[in-house]
Amino acid sequence: MDKKEQDRLKKEAAEKAANMVQSGMILGVGTGSTVAFFIDALGKRKDEEDLKLKAIVTTSNRSKKQLESLGFEVSELADIDQADLTVDGSDRVADNLDGIKGGGGALTLEKNVAINSKKIVWIVDESKLVHRLSGFPLPVEVLPISCEQNFRRFEQEGLKPQWRTDGDKRYITHYGNYIIDLAVDPIPAPHGLADYLDHTVGVVEHGLFLDMCDEVIIAHSDGTIEDKIK
């Protein structure tokens, strides 16, 4: 599938998600190429239908700047109690709607917005669908003070760690941390791995989004749009 076709699919899925947004909502907005199409569709609804939102929170400066350029005011997560709806993308989505996220490095804020949402919808094209979580490195955000120990421990556990880099340097997250990508593929027991990472000192957050997503909007290459609801 070429990029032009992939972008067309992403745009179709994003427009369907944008039609779920209602005036008066507190909206969570994720990050990534598919979400950029979603934000464009929101802007169109704002202009054509006078869509008015109570508040918007987002997971990246890129999404924030795009929203503000379209006339939306963006709030901080601390300023809201709970989003009515959060729309985001996902790097991989399994049959049971579990996902791997964090390819763009914003996994910690993405998960914080997600857990403070009444409903979570992911928008993807069919290339992101997998039977079980696989085909994409699992991001783990780690504190610099203990990152070397974390890396060695992951090696000992057979998780195939790799430092995420930015040029010839280690990638630094919004919060000043590093990311270790785990190349274990497929992930044999996602809940077990999530529990292990949750209890590992020095791990800030990981990209396993389990039992969180309520609905996935999928754009297929044949032009059809599929809704998968948990």
Curated annotation (Swiss-Prot):
InterPro entries: NagB/RpiA_transferase-like, Ribose-5P_isomerase, Ribose5P_isomerase_typA_subgr, Ribose5P_isomerase_type_A. One of its GO terms (biological process) is pentose-phosphate shunt, non-oxidative branch. Its EC number is 5.3.1.6. The gene is rpiA. Keywords: Isomerase. Catalyzes the reversible conversion of ribose-5-phosphate to ribulose 5-phosphate. SUPFAM superfamilies: D-ribose-5-phosphate isomerase (RpiA), lid domain (SSF75445), NagB/RpiA/CoA transferase-like (SSF100950). The active site is at E110 (proton acceptor). Homodimer. It catalyses: aldehydo-D-ribose 5-phosphate = D-ribulose 5-phosphate. CDD domains: RPI_A. It is an enzyme of class 5 (isomerase). One of its GO terms (molecular function) is ribose-5-phosphate isomerase activity. Substrate binds at T31, G32, S33, T34, D88, G89, S90, D91, K101, G102, G103, G104, K128. This is Ribose-5-phosphate isomerase A. Belongs to the ribose 5-phosphate isomerase family. It comes from the Bacteria. Pfam families: Rib_5-P_isom_A. Pathway: Carbohydrate degradation; pentose phosphate pathway; D-ribose 5-phosphate from D-ribulose 5-phosphate (non-oxidative stage): step 1/1.
